[in-house]
Amino acid sequence: VLWAQGAATIDWLSDENLTTVNWRTTEASSASKEASAAIAQGDTEAFEALLPQRQPYAAARDEAAFKLVRGVILEGQIDATHPLGYGFTDEVLPMFRRSANFMARSENAYSTPVLYSATPLLSGYMSAENQALASGSASLIVDARGKGAVVLALDAVTFRAFWWGTQKLLLNALFFGDLLEEPR
């Protein structure tokens, strides 16, 4: 079992073709990618149409801060029948979150043992756009590869050893790693 934690690690694994992940993106990020594609094709009209509206410089810092996700608690829904869910008795699992990256659910219906609820924010501040991205997104994905598996985890399940509720996920990956296969 390979436990991959954090967006940068997951991106690297994806770039090296060791796993596959689909990211949910903000409207601004999608527009930026479309604008880059338009300029690469020489379509300046499409490029101009995709550029964001001009904003006052003084507002930049505040706007950027509102888009951050720093220390929120989100409502995860765990599949207690999954090997990573062993020992959990409640379907609701509060997850500590420090990142504004969100993964789409796995293409395999059995490989997303923890996903966020429809209204995930339990505590802290999160922009409406990030709440919409988090809604129904994956917190953990198991990607079976050959005789092993890669566990993709965006959240720090053992964050500073004070977030006790989710530490079992990591321990279950260690103890039940041989059971982490993708049912087809």
How should these model regions be labeled?
Residues 1-84:
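A glycine-rich, often tryptophan-bearing local segment used as a flexible ligand/cofactor-contacting loop or short
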Residues 81-83, 87-101, 105-184:
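Extracellular ligand-binding/catalytic regions of CAZymes and related secreted enzymes
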